């Protein structure tokens, strides 16, 4: 019984023509994730500090967030994206550097929103670090 010959190499992604989208920047204490989606929320490109080869505590640096944002921005520009709204969420150190990196790639930024969830006295926070 012969199997159908299928190639194992990945298919080339089809180029979408999307002019505007939303960049979701999730900056945690340990990592920074950037997802660029269209207006409906379908992901077009993504990147993170860990995906760029940073490991451990170097993932949480502003430079790692900048490299990740540049990578996600380049991938999104390949699909024809030119204008971005930016949604920043989380308390991490890579928030501003990711924003500046997306500007440097050449996007026209129309809006910046901070969607960090703020508790109205919800769960008890972690204990204060003493170094």
From Swiss-Prot:
Keywords: Ribonucleoprotein, Ribosomal protein, RNA-binding, rRNA-binding. The lineage of its organism: Bacteria, Pseudomonadati, Pseudomonadota, Alphaproteobacteria, Acetobacterales. One of its GO terms (molecular function) is structural constituent of ribosome. Gene3D superfamilies: Ribosomal protein S11. The keyword Ribosomal protein applies. This is Small ribosomal subunit protein uS11. Part of the 30S ribosomal subunit. Interacts with proteins S7 and S18. Binds to IF-3. InterPro entries: Ribosomal_uS11, Ribosomal_uS11_bac-type, Ribosomal_uS11_CS, Ribosomal_uS11_sf. PANTHER family: 40S RIBOSOMAL PROTEIN S14/30S RIBOSOMAL PROTEIN S11. Belongs to the universal ribosomal protein uS11 family. It comes from the Bacteria. GO terms for cellular component: ribonucleoprotein complex; ribosome.
